[in-house]
């Protein structure tokens, strides 16, 4: 799968998901390509999809960890995850982690065209849509490593977009109460 230019994490991931759906894959795995996600956790994530529709590599469950982040970044990440979990009523501790394994059969059940976030807010939005479809979630503890390549793309614009997405989804009139 090759795309010209950078169109955002959500856009890239949705293109990969559409490809997996069209080609009848069983499972699709997403992960960061900067070495912050250790491939050693891959088999545990895929194995978790035998019992769950979505397996999330989680920094925030027992056994999970973050390596080499300053305290303020850890606190901000935890606070944003708690806000997302509360506003969207998600049964997940790490809503913003991108290391995931999805059962393609469950992805096929949601309307991918309804997902509007193109940046990092996509991570919470797809979980919300899956939760609305009664997806079963599992969290697999991982250690998140400081990236070895590239720079963070998180910006004030991304943060504002995430908040706007949370508000849009939390107050959707067709939202199912949990």
Region roles according to the model:
Residues 1, 29-31, 55:
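Conserved Rossmann-like nucleotide-binding pocket used by diverse enzymes
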Residues 3-22, 39-120, 147-157, 161-163:
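Acceptor/aglycone-binding surface of glycosyltransferases and processive sugar-polymer synthases
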Residues 3-5, 31-33, 140:
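Cofactor-binding loops of NAD(P)H-dependent oxidoreductases
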Residues 25-36:
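Short beta-strand-to-loop acidic/aromatic patch adjacent to the donor-nucleotide binding site
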Residues 31, 58, 143:
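Conserved residues at the C-terminal ends of beta-strands
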Residues 35, 44, 124-125:
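An aromatic- and histidine-rich active-site surface loop
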Residues 40, 50, 105-106, 132-134, ...:
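Terminal low-complexity segments of carbohydrate-biosynthetic enzymes
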Residues 90-91, 114-116, 127-144:
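Catalytic donor-sugar/metal-binding loop of nucleotide-sugar-dependent glycosyltransferases
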């Amino acid at each position: 799968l090759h795309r010209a230019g950078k169109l955002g994490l959500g856009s890239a991931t949705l293109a990969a998901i559409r490809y997996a759906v069209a080609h009848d894959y069983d499972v699709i795995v997403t992960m960061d390509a900067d070495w912050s996600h250790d491939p050693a956790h891959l088999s545990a994530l895929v194995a978790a999809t035998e019992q769950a529709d979505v397996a999330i590599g989680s920094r925030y469950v027992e056994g999970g960890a973050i390596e080499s982040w300053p305290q303020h970044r850890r606190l901000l990440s935890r606070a944003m995850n708690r806000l997302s979990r509360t506003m969207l009523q998600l049964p997940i501790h790490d809503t913003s982690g991108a290391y995931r394994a999805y059962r393609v059969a469950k992805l096929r059940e949601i309307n991918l065209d309804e997902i509007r976030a193109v940046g990092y807010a996509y991570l919470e939005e797809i979980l919300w849509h899956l939760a609305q479809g009664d997806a079963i979630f599992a969290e697999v503890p991982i250690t998140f490593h400081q990236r070895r390549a590239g720079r963070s793309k998180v910006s004030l614009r991304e943060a504002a977009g995430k908040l706007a997405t949370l508000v849009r989804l939390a107050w959707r009139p067709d939202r199912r109460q949990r």
